[in-house]
Amino acid sequence: MTALSPRRTFSGTALKTIACITMLVDHIGASCIEAGILTPGLDAGTLSQDALSAYPLYRLDMVLRFTGRLAFPLFCFLLVEGFVHTHNVKGYLGRLVLFGLLSEVPFDLAFFRTPFDFSAQNVYWTLALGVLAMAGLKRFEKENGLPGWQGLMWAGGCAALALAVNTDYHAIGVLIICTLYLTRADRKRQCLAGALLFLFELTAPLAFVLVWFYNGQRGACSPLQKKAFYWFYPVHLLVLAGITNLML
């Protein structure tokens, strides 16, 4: 890792808080506005496609979704940091899998208005596969620090699995996590690589401005706060699902 400037002020806890807030903003648009109003209106014929662009809620939705694009890049970066610094990869992976299971029904309720929808899976599965991919890259790393072909094949398999089951951000999410892991020794290269790979989402590369100012410290985070960060995803999805259901 390149030397960090003393002017860099964002701790890991600060970045995680920003990621959670922007994710909430994004999901208000995706769940309450899109799944709760726009999509039902189009399906019922009460809202035409031609009028959609002039619809005030459509414009609000665009603002919310563009703001929310910052969340996933931050979570990917923080996942890499967590993997690099954890002393228990199995425990780290286990928590992600556990919350993937706990979050699936809230995810389906929030975005598909049904408790069981197998067409898409929540982001915890993408993060879990990202950890698996990084574990493979680390296991088969060469003495010069470059990834071995076995590790690349393993990571590719994890990305293929994400694509097959359609996790949130699917294969590209896993591949971006791997790229951030492989470029972790140079913050400038890591930020540039991440920003370039997220160009498919207009505002997502801006997340790496925040990453650039990461100070390399975990920051104040009590055991309760750590648990709260894990629980935030399924709980906020349940709340949004409830709000959306009241709107229908």
Task: Name each model-derived stretch.
Residues 1-248:
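Alpha-helical transmembrane segments and their immediate juxtamembrane cytosolic regions
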